[in-house]
Amino acid sequence: FTFNNPLKNFYFKYIKRQNPYSEIAVNDLLMKFKENIKIIKGDTNKILKELNLQNIEYIFIDGGHNYNTVKNDLFYSKKFISENGIILCDDYDLSYAPGVKQAIDEFVKENNCKFELILDRFAKIEL
């Protein structure tokens, strides 16, 4: 079940006059939660190994769609996540990017994680 809010589309098209998925719109939304969110922008294959993060309770991955990138993202997420943390991955079962599903399935199996598919799109991984 997917809910589409027509008021959201009207608001962004005629009042805000911006794409609701643009970087500006997303940053405006996330600023409401700035005490709890840290946005890190860049190529995860390069920046994740440079970060010093720990005890992150929730990680949302919406990144590259190739196998090696997803493996890298999950490898570092495991290092950063707290005990009983949750990793949510977007685009789990894309027909044109089978490496995403393969990397996630391998990670879940290798790390004995709980797995839940949400809305046929998101992979919820509990460590």
Question: Language-model features: where?
Answer:
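S-adenosylmethionine/decaboxylated-SAM
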Residues: 1-127
